[in-house]
C-alpha cells in the first residue's frame, strides 16, 4: 500500500469516527433531556405529596408556601 493510500485510509477512519461520535453525542442529549424532565416531574410529585400532608407542610414551609 502506498503512502497516499494509507493517508486516505487514515482520513476516512478519522471522518467516520467523528461522524459516529457526533451522532452519539446528539442522541445522548435527547436522553439527558428526557431524564431531566422525568426527574423534575418526580420532584414535583414528591413536593405535591408533601404539601398535602399537614405535618410535612408545616416542616417545609419554604417548599409548600
Swiss-Prot record:
Disulfide bonds: 50-56, 51-64
Domain of life, source organism: Eukaryota
GO cellular component, one term: extracellular region
Propeptide: 22-48
Keywords: Acetylcholine receptor inhibiting toxin, Amidation, Disulfide bond, Ion channel impairing toxin, Neurotoxin, Postsynaptic neurotoxin, Secreted, Signal, Toxin
Cellular location(s): Secreted
One Pfam family linked to the record: Toxin_8
Region (Ser-Xaa-Pro motif, crucial for potent interaction with nAChR): 52-54
Positions of transmembrane segments: none
Modified residues (Cysteine amide): 64
Tissue spec. comment: Expressed by the venom duct.
Keyword DNA repair annotated: no
GO terms assigned for molecular function: acetylcholine receptor inhibitor activity; ion channel regulator activity; toxin activity
Main location class: secreted
Residues spanning the signal sequence: 1-21
Family affiliation: Belongs to the conotoxin A superfamily.
Written domain comment of the UniProt record: The cysteine framework is I (CC-C-C). Alpha4/7 pattern.
Function, as annotated: Alpha-conotoxins act on postsynaptic membranes, they bind to the nicotinic acetylcholine receptors (nAChR) and thus inhibit them. This toxin inhibits acetylcholine-evoked currents reversibly in oocytes expressing the human alpha-7/CHRNA7 nAChR, and blocks nerve-evoked skeletal muscle contractions in isolated mouse neuromuscular preparations, but with a very low affinity.
UniProt name for this protein: Alpha-conotoxin BnIA
Organism: Conus bandanus
Amino acid at each position: 500500500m502506498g503512502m497516499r493510500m494509507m493517508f486516505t485510509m487514515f482520513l476516512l477512519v478519522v471522518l467516520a469516527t467523528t461522524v459516529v461520535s457526533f451522532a452519539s453525542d446528539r442522541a445522548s442529549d435527547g436522553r439527558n433531556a428526557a431524564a431531566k424532565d422525568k426527574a423534575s416531574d418526580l420532584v414535583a410529585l414528591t413536593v405535591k405529596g408533601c404539601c398535602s400532608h399537614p405535618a410535612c407542610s408545616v416542616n417545609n414551609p419554604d417548599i409548600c408556601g
